[in-house]
Amino acid sequence: MKSFVKIVGLALGALLFSVSAAAFDHSHKAWDDLVKKHVVLINGGKASKVNYVAFGKDRAALKAYLDSLSAVPESEFKGWSKPQQMAFLINAYNGYTVELILQNYPVKSIKDIGGVFDNRWKRKFFKLFGQDFYLDKIEHETLRKPGAYDEPRVHFAVNCASIGCPMLREEAFTADKLDRQLEEQTVRFLSDRSRNRYADGKLEVSMIFNWFKDDWSSGYKGFDGKTPAITSREAWFARYAKVLADAPADQQKIAEGKAAIGHLEYDWSLNGAH
């Protein structure tokens, strides 16, 4: 009898786990609906702005989505595929960044939130996996953790609510489209001449490539392990030479790794649409 009860208990536990796993919406439709509604494409689709005033009127829908993320147990998350995990973490980062802005709106820059002893990126204002979490914990301690995903393109997917940052995507990231979405975000950002350009004999790129340059020199092969190992920024820029420069001669210099590299000033102004 005891063994029968034990078997029933185990079966029930497995059933509950499977129901829980099935219950999470990996299409992230709730977030998809919100960004489709409140993200405005600019610069020919290479950048975006966010209508935070209108977003604030959909606060209940945003809260419901963020609550669905917080409800996912860590054990369930660990059982997902890497693309599912990454899509979850990227959307979570972007969703909680919007929430942080709305909590402090109106604000001219995300850097105006908090101070020396209350870093906005280390503020524990939400929960994931039953733990107090903060934005840096998602980006730097999880997404960028060596050996976890090894995917430099994630820098073009997470959005820090700033003009200098890669755009907030106008759709949710999903596992089935992740590689295409990451590549498209990369090309959009690199082709935006306000943030990356070849000028006066120099390749001028975003400060992102300076702050996180180790991500382009650690031999990363992408989340699926299929990307040729990334060993240097110069080698990676060479892959995107036709995106980074407009003139064929300039593209050739980048492709050959002969371009001098400089960094553009980062614009921390809020990416708000008016």
Predicted segments, located by residue:
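Bacterial N-terminal signal peptides that target proteins for export
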Residues: 1-9
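N-terminal signal peptide c-region/cleavage motif recognized by signal peptidases
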Residues: 18-20
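Interaction/scaffold regions that mediate signaling and macromolecular assembly across diverse proteins
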Residues: 24-79, 83-90, 94-274
